[in-house]
Amino acid sequence: MNTAPKQYGFYMPAEWYPHERCWMAWPCHHETWSKIGLDKAKMAYARVAKAIAQFEPVTLLVNPGDEDSAKNLCKGHNIEIISLPINDSWTRDTGATFLINNERQLAGVDWIHNAWGGNYADCSLDNFIASHIIKYTEAQYFHAPLVMEGGSFHVDGEGTILTSKECLLNSNRNPHLSQQEIEQYLINYLGAERIIWLNMGLIGDETDGHVDEIATFIAPGKVLCLITKDKEDPNYHRLQENFEILKSSKDARGRTFEVYTVEQPPATYLNGERLTLSYINFYMANQGIVMPAFGYESFDRLAYQLFVQIFPGYQITQIDALDVFSGGGGIHCITQQQPKSHKLVEQ
């Protein structure tokens, strides 16, 4: 850990820091999209990419031979296509985690990926996505000796990390490490000072409780937390517990959080399995927010109205995202922001 980014002054900026681009990957894994099929998955990803491209460039990784479908569905928009062999399409988890320093130089962290604790047999190609992205952006490369996914943590860019015990302390990730050792890795590789641990994620989450489904930073000293008013819902107690933890926590600068809440949509099932639907799983672009709608008019409307309130100065774009969530994740899961840096990327 002597070569960790923090000692060189690098840290992960908050998602509201200006972006150079957004990274995505084109759907390709048949098992992931077995509920709806690859064609519908590609159309769903195209909706997200085009919505984000209103605000910033999108770079899309596409398996060789599948470029035509990406070009046809994303034609005429601010979207660049790069051919790269991939196993799956969740760049939040498999892509680089970007860092900057006070000189606005760019670095990238390459975590170890084990397909969310071994959910899928082959993730060999995805283990190279981060290094390819880092090389493409000419960022400084850091390899982290830790199994980690980008959706398992949030940062405020001011020293605070938000994560969950269900995921990071799961025996299918880093069983040889203690909580204290994992904390030290996070602090050193994300350039932070304090970690806030939530306990449990959503019931049925294939990622073992990624935090980007349950809570996120929305501004310095402010967090947004998922809740449900339905006491019979199996998520009720775990979401309420997370809410209480956030209310009683302070960030790295000693601020008590201002906690906003958004209600989860009604339980929704596909092929007998409950989908992990959450309005928390959105993408914050340059002056824009791309957030999900799930087809529940009153819930979607209330979530939209809340976002208008808590994100002043941002254009809120709400898109049908049920098909994205059918694959086990959401809008935040399929995107990865690259912060603006001192040296522009050479094309």
Curated annotation (Swiss-Prot):
Catalyzed reaction equations: agmatine + H2O = N-carbamoylputrescine + NH4(+)
Matches recorded under SUPFAM superfamilies: Pentein (SSF55909)
GO-annotated biological processes: putrescine biosynthetic process
Transferase found in the keyword field: no
HAMAP family listed in its UniProt record: Agmatine_deimin (MF_01841)
Family assignment from sequence similarity: Belongs to the agmatine deiminase family.
Protein's recorded name: Putative agmatine deiminase
Species in which this protein is naturally found: Legionella pneumophila (strain Lens)
Name of the encoding gene: aguA
